[in-house]
């Protein structure tokens, strides 16, 4: 198995316009080469590569318009490659969109961020994930899932307080 990411910015440079056929041809050749060598490809549709135009114009996944543009991109990639690729990931490390620093992964350029902004980004990315999952299941014989970030953590001491903090952090960060 070989996991690759199709760069949204390479395929749709402005994020919501025309598809770059040269970029699609590159990934088509890559997938064919993997399969010819007996290597099963797994496609990730988003690995922190928000098209700059969408970040500047709409503040990334804070906008439902960006969610819609991403779903359009994802559906097109599925139409192009799902006959050859049986394993899909929508968002790399999707749980990071619901944690401190979410703006770095979601194309948000806004300086003053609120808790509501984080909820909005997570809501829009979850909607995109659900829409693409439904699209894939309704149209192709393929599997789709998520990719979560985890962090190995240890208590500073053996004290009950440090261990309680560790459990709370682990539950929120690694298991949400």
Explain the meaning of each model-derived region:
Residues 1-7, 40:
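Catalytic domains of carbohydrate-active enzymes, especially glycoside hydrolases
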Residues 11-176:
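Non-catalytic scaffold segments within catalytic domains of secreted glycoside hydrolases
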């Amino acid at each position: 198995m070989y996991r690759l990411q199709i760069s949204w910015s390479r395929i749709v440079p402005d994020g919501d316009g025309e598809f770059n056929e040269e970029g699609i041809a590159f990934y088509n050749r890559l997938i064919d080469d993997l399969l010819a060598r007996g290597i099963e490809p797994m496609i990730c549709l988003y690995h922190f590569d928000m098209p700059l135009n969408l970040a500047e114009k709409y503040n990334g996944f804070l906008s439902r318009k960006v969610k819609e543009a991403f779903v359009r991109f994802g559906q097109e990639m599925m139409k192009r490659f799902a006959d050859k690729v049986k394993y899909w990931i929508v968002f790399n490390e999707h749980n990071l969109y619901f944690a401190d620093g979410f703006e770095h992964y979601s194309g948000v350029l806004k300086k003053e961020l609120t808790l509501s902004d984080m909820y909005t980004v997570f809501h829009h990315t979850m909607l995109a994930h659900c829409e693409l999952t439904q699209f894939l299941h309704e149209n192709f014989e393929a599997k789709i899932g998520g990719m979560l970030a985890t962090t190995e953590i240890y208590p500073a001491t053996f004290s009950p307080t440090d261990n309680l903090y560790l459990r709370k952090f682990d539950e929120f960060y690694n298991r949400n």
